């Protein structure tokens, strides 16, 4: 009986300790999330787009000096990706970067994360924020497909389209069966991250990795095995190219349970995204610039970008061209804005003559 009581006591104590740790983790995440929102959201603002949804956006530069430049990020990325580009353009161009539903500081997503749905949410944001056309749209990776869809649906409001190594539908399921396993592994890893995020473990890891000694995050990375180490290395490589002041915000985003729900929604829509954009029609009379790294094959079908499409190679870049060669992206944007302004001026006398 004495042995049984001891066993029961040990089990009960372990269960109580586990419950207390779980409660502490939940409380840590709840408090940390609130502190993050109060401290880190200041550069931008939340804009309502209907049905209770809000999108977080950051504006830089003066309005009214030519077309506004609108940025769209890749998978899992937010407006932070464009901060250095916005800063470089701030004195000459009006720019807007934002977080898609499900990512960053924006509301949870309520629709499938395909280019069509995301482009419509962006259109609602621009309308609600009073960002008038014409626009120069800039999209990276998945964001390139979003901006391509936007250009197809709102061609008359476009000034130019700049695609930075856009996602290629033929490289993803269902067209590339070999990528299916990679997508499924990413989904599983994201689900695990979401569980850890709810109890504060991801917050500890993110703070450790981005803002402190990285000992705790290093332990978790080793625990995740080869895939975790590969992912961490890629993140370090790309995030290391971003301004140091954004790291607390990156840590905050990667700490939040809603981030993993949003990222999972994007991953679950990969096949639908590939199908939608593989069958997309060609863009009309809009200037389109496609930037790809030298290590990538050129676009297989430039016809999809219309009669004014052109291809440029970023010689010193990998996939994240706007981080590897920001000066190239800045100059490409300035050229597009200048061309749009010049074309608008040439059109004005023609409009007056018709009137």
What feature does the model see in each segment?
Residues 30-67, 80, 84:
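N-terminal signal-anchor transmembrane helix
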């Amino acid at each position: 009986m004495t042995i049984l009581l001891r066993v029961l006591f040990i089990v009960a104590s372990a269960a109580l300790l586990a419950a207390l740790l779980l409660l502490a983790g939940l409380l840590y995440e709840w408090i940390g999330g609130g502190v993050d929102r109060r401290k880190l959201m200041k550069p931008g603002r939340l804009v309502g787009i209907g049905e209770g949804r809000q999108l977080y956006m950051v504006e830089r530069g003066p309005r009214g000096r030519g077309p506004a430049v609108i940025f769209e990020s890749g998978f899992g990325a937010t407006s932070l990706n464009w901060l250095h580009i916005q800063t470089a353009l701030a004195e000459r161009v009006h720019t807007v970067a934002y977080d898609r539903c499900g990512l960053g500081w924006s509301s949870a997503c309520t629709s499938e994360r395909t280019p069509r749905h995301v482009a419509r949410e962006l259109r609602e944001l621009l309308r609600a924020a009073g960002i008038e056309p014409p626009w120069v749209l800039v999209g990276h990776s998945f964001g390139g497909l979003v901006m391509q869809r936007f250009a197809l649906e709102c061609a008359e409001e476009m000034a130019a389209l700049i695609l930075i190594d856009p996602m290629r539908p033929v490289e993803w399921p269902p067209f590339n069966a070999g990528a299916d396993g990679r997508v499924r592994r990413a989904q599983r890893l994201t689900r695990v991250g979401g569980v850890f995020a709810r109890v504060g473990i991801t917050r500890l890891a993110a703070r450790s990795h981005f803002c402190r000694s990285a000992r705790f995050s290093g332990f978790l990375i080793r625990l995740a095995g080869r895939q975790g180490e590969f992912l961490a290395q890629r993140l370090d490589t790309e995030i290391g190219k971003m301004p140091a002041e954004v790291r607390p915000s990156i840590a905050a985003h990667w700490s939040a349970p809603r981030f993993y729900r949003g990222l999972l929604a994007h991953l679950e829509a990969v096949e639908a995204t590939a199908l939608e954009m593989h069958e997309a029609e060609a863009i009309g009379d809009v200037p389109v610039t496609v930037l790809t790294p030298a290590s990538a094959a050129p676009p297989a079908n430039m016809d999809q970008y219309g009669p004014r499409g052109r291809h440029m190679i970023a010689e010193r870049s990998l996939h994240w061209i706007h981080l590897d060669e920001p000066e190239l992206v800045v100059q490409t944007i300035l050229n597009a804005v200048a061309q749009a302004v010049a074309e608008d001026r040439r059109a004005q006398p023609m409009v007056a003559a018709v009137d």
